Structures are given as structure tokens and as C-alpha cells.
Amino acid sequence: STESVLRDYFHAKDENRPHYMARAFAPQAVLKMALRTQAIAFPPESHGLAAITDTLVRKFGQTYENVYTFYLARPEADVRLSDYSCDWIVGMTEKATGNVRVGCGRYAWTFQPEPYRATQLTITIETMVTLPPSDADAVFGWLLALDYPWTNARRVVAGAPPLEDLAPVVQYLLHPL
């Protein structure tokens, strides 16, 4: 189902388990990154399961930990959609500095019917903010109070800590493009 593919992707990326990527992506899949911020870097395109896994799991996992990504919508249970798009939010820490990163944007998925896997994922990163390690308790207290990995923008905004640095994220969630 669409839901299980999306869940397997987070098992791979958030939990640093590369073997899960083969349950989410077809061997010839394409990843496209649309960055609307300079705060994080990714190659604009990755072609094939190995390259996508390297970009989204192995290299990502070398740089970040405590990764919690949330889908801000949920596909119907037990359906196999040909495409699916939704907003997302992520919170994580930089291994090297302890700084906290919070970002948000949009996923646009395209799937093949058999075996049911993603053939394309476009990740748009609308904003990514960096907060000092001293804000980690407030940020992760907020994120860990959410239902993982499915929530909605209203719940995210309602529980957001009053940190000025989070304003761009909250603004996007209140007024997605």
C-alpha cells in the first residue's frame, strides 16, 4: 500500500536502516531535490536505488541523528495510489555540533504497480532553520508529543514552542504554497 511504502521510507531514512529502501523504491527510481533554502545541501538528482539510498540514508545518517520526520497527511489505508503528495516536517540534530535542525516542505511521489514501489520522489525543502543545542529539549519535547509519523499541520503548529527561530517553519505550515 502507499502507506506502507511511505512508512518503509521513514524506517530507512529516520532510523538509518538502508535495507528498507528496497521496500520503498524501484531499482530505477529517480530522486529530485528542490531546495528553496541554502541551509542544507543535496544533489539535485539521484538515479537508481543505490544512489538514492546513499543520498537519503547513508550520507544523511553520517551527518544527522535524532531524526524525526512527519507526514502532514495520510493516504487511505490499503490503497495503492499512482501518485501521492503531502507536506512534511523534520526535526534532527547535527552530529558534529549538536545544533538542532527543523525543516519542512513537500513530498511528491510516483509509484509503479508491480512490484508496488516508488519510481520517483521529488522532495521540496521550503525552509530549514538551525537552532542551538540549548533548544533541543524544547524542540524534541514538541516533536515527540506528536503522533509519529502521521500528523497534521494544525497539531504541529498548536504544540510548537515559542522559539523565534522556528517562525519560518510555523509560517510555512500555516500558509503552505
Predicted regions and their residues:
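Terminal "cap-and-tail" regions of soluble proteins that handle hydrophobic small molecules
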Residues: 1-7, 11, 91-177
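Short, low-complexity N-terminal intrinsically disordered segments enriched in polar/charged residues
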Residues: 1-11, 15, 19, 23, ...
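Generic hydrophobic secondary-structure signal
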Residues: 24-25, 31, 52, 115, ...
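A solvent-exposed, acidic/Ser-Thr-rich amphipathic alpha-helical stretch
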Residues: 27-88
